[in-house]
Amino acid sequence: MKLLFLALLSLLALGPSLAARRRGVRWCTISKPEAAKCSKLQQNLKRVRGPSLSCISRKSYLECIQAIAAKRADAMSLDAGLVYEAGQDPYRLRPVAAEVYGTEGAPRTHYYAVALVKKDSNLQLNQLQGVRSCHTGLNRSAGWKIPVGTLRPYLGWAGPPAPLQEAVANFFSASCVPCADGNQYPNLCRLCAGTGADKCACSSKEPYFGYSGAFKCLKDGAGDVAFVKDSTVFENLPNKAERDQYELLCPDNTRKPVDEFEQCHLARVPSHAVVARSVGGKEDSIWRLLSKAQEKFGKGTSGSFQLFSSPPGQKDLLFKDGAQGFLRIPSRVDAELYLGPSYLTVIKNLKESAAEVEARGARVVWCAVGPEELRKCQQWSGQSNGTVTCTTAADTEDCIALVLKGEADAMSLDGGVIYIAGKCGLAPVLAESQRSEGGSNLDCVNRPLEGDRAVAVVRKSSAGLTWNSRRGTKSCHTAVGRTAGWNIPMGLLFNQTRSCNFDEFFSQSCAPGADPNSNLCALCVGNEQGQDKCAPNSNERYFSYAGSFRCLVENAGDVAFVKASTVLENPDGRGTEAWAKDLKLEDFELLCLDGTRKPVSEFETCHLARAPSHGVVSRKDRVQYLEQVLLDQQGKFGRNGPLCPGKFCLFQSETKNLLFNDNTECLAKLQGKTTYEKYLGPEYVTAVANLRQCSTSPLLEACTFLRN
């Protein structure tokens, strides 16, 4: 009994510390100096009554990544190259806070990977074969992935399964690549200065490890070129006269002074980031800890402990010494979004054979929203003999994210979503030009873009309903964020009321993409089984133009916000679906902004606004190729193509408006409207920006962070 009592006392004594560790953040360190700094941070946080911190020791970044994934640690800061590795299976970590560089007046969450040489050398970037090289570490961004990716054409590397490290070892006469396997590839560790087991070590035990170590390798004369970041030489040589003894190698085989890194660099790289688990990652706790740490011990503080400083002889412990602070990364950002398409392309190029790289560049990956679009896309892919392949996502924003990450190339979007895509850095490729009477296919491709009219349509029998009396009625919308169904009518409503409480203006609505538990989803019906209610894809039967009009036709709503062409395409036998078969155009009318009503045929004088055409978007580096492929594809499968309707039609759908609008005559050239601002027009861009005061999208928030 006495032993049991003592055991209980022991557990009670341990309990608070165990609970504190669960609540607190466990930071992973990779060396004794890092562990010592972590311990000091822990003590100083305790002194200022900050968040709880404990320190976990491992031997390498990989072991720390594994510990975080296994819930034996919670966080650490990683170079972008390691952020990529940590974001892959089986770890699936994500960046939660970015280190901020630059100055207080001009902060930035990126840096530039550069190739640094001594001024008295005669080297150019295309003359590095056979020289001695200094690297920050294996698989790190500025020191390995970027330079090796840049030099790939000269390496004589056929791609996997041939080892990349072997190709690099044979390319340079000697190197120091900390973390490399010196037994298997001795040339990669030949220049390293560590002794015994510390030679080529993956930590500061190797004097030439990290940015400052790679620079020291060059400065000491061990190497001829150092692959580092733009600030490395400034941090190690405060004296300008000393810095002037070094120059940068530029991709165009010229050289520039070290302060011209924005014009002479190998790549722009996202800054180091603190990573955590994607699920159950303690993101809020980590951010509270970082916020308190930078407030109490960051730049400009006077205490003896400095968060962004390392003891003499050490560099970049826990965080970069040159960091100014942290910025929280929006929750929508995963490792691939954080790194961006250019950096991801470099990484993919290092994982694929030359043939695979070429094949990937020749393919067009279309992003289909939902299962119905995917089925049509797969039909297209089969008929295109693999020129077009398909991927899918649940909604348009997820598709945009796939395009940003290089996992997809293109999709066609409503103008409101083109706004988000443009803010994220994508560009228009071709526009959906509406079907018109007469005119050849060539005329259509080169025809000036007109767009469509956004209208408010009601049943003729609801005689008392006007634009001025729509408060309290039931409304049908194409989807939240879409042009005719949301941005235009709700933008007008916001201008009228200056209120964002849209769910209080109408009694009930169906606005796919809204909160499923709100009034804005009350009229939505989901699929035939009642699932996916209010989903922003074709699983919701009241989604998009035809769905919004169907919501009105089936008496769910009193007013539907659609395009004029939507109303014209469905009545009088034009609509093929069961709900549209007995409709008559004369049974519907339009609400005019002046409070009157007019027949649908008079939409030119009774509409809410002109809506920009749907358009195909892609990454800027793919626009020219996408235009070429899509014009070729519509030459075969377009409205006048020889294989439509026999084989496949781009602009026909089993249901409605899959991949493209069914009333598209052709994909037309942009007539100079090559940016999202020019494509949408200044008035529409301003209207959407104003409406964004009421709500933002997680993707738009993420892109705003990533592009600053």
From Swiss-Prot:
Binding site for Fe(3+) 2: 414, 452, 545, 614
EC number: 3.4.21.-
Binding site for hydrogencarbonate 2: 478, 482, 484-485
UniProt binding sites for hydrogencarbonate 1: 136, 140, 142-143
Glycosylation site positions: 139, 385, 495
Protein keywords: Antibiotic, Antimicrobial, Blood coagulation cascade inhibiting toxin, Disulfide bond, Glycoprotein, Hemostasis impairing toxin, Hydrolase, Immunity, Ion transport, Iron, Iron transport, Metal-binding, Osteogenesis, Protease, Repeat, Secreted, Serine protease, Signal, Toxin, Transport
GO-annotated molecular function: metal ion binding; serine-type peptidase activity; toxin activity
Top EC class, one word: hydrolase
Disulfide bonds: 28-64, 38-55, 134-217, 176-192, 179-202, 189-200, 250-264, 367-399, 377-390, 476-551, 510-524, 521-534, 592-606
Binding site for Fe(3+) 1: 79, 111, 211, 272
InterPro entries the UniProt entry points to: Transferrin, Transferrin-like_dom, Transferrin_Fe_BS
Database matches in CDD domains: PBP2_transferrin_C, PBP2_transferrin_N
Catalytic machinery residues: 92, 278 (nucleophile)
Function (record text): Transferrins are iron binding transport proteins which can bind two Fe(3+) ions in association with the binding of an anion, usually bicarbonate.
Family: Belongs to the transferrin family.
Protein name: Lactotransferrin
Organism: Desmodus rotundus (Vampire bat)
